[in-house]
Amino acid sequence: MKRHLPLLAAALLAGSGGALTVTGRVTGTVPAETRISGWAVSASGQPVQEMVSVPVVGGQFRLEIPTTAPSFRAQTALNAQNVSWPGVLDPVSVSAETQTAELKFFTYRDLNRNGQHDEGEPLREVTVNAGRGTLFVVWVNSDVTVRASRGYEATLKRGWNAFIVEVGRAVNITPFVDGSVEVTLNLGR
C-alpha cells in the first residue's frame, strides 16, 4: 500500500551554491514522530550523511538544505562513466571531472524524539514529484555541465543545485527556483 502526501512546495536557490529551501503542506495521515530528511547518498543510492531533517508539524514542514559541502565520504567523483542520475542515458559527457553528491529524501519515525536519525529507525526513501517531473538535488565542488542522450543537459554551479527532471521522448530539465509547484511524496509501505 502506498500513501501519497501532496505538498505545496516552493524552493529558493540563491545563486551559485546558495541555500535551498523546500517548504510544504502535507495532507494525509502521518504519525507525529515522522521527520522528512535530506541525505547525501553514495553512488549506489545508499544514505551516507543526513544533511537536514525536520518534523512534520501541523501538516507542514520546511527543509533548509545547508550551504555546506557534504562530508568527503558522501562525495564521489563525477565522470562520464558513473552518472546515474534521473533521465541520464548513454552516451554521457561531463565537461570537467569534479566531486559530487546526490541528495535524496527520506522519512523516518523519530522514536526517541531526539531530532535526528538513530540506529533502529528505518529510513523510507520518498520520491518528490513535481507535475510530470521529479525533484533532483545535487552538489558539485566546481562548475560542470552534464550532457546525455535524448536532450539531457544540466549546467551545475558549485554548491547545491536543484532541478525538475521530466523524462519522456526527450528529457526536459528546468531549474527548481523561485515560485510554487505541486509536489507529491510517495511513501511506500
Language-model segment annotations:
Residues 64-77, 139-141:
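Short Pro-Gly-centered beta-turn/loop motif in secreted/extracellular proteins
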Residues 10-18:
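Hydrophobic h-region of N-terminal signal peptides that target proteins for export
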Residues 24, 52-67:
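Glycine-centered loop-to-beta-strand initiation motif
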Residues 2-8:
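Sec-dependent signal peptide recognition
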Residues 20-29, 105:
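A short, amphipathic beta-strand motif
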Residues 110-122:
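Acidic, glycine-anchored loop motifs typical of Ca2+
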Residues 29-44:
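Short, ordered, surface-exposed loop/turn motifs in non-cytosolic proteins
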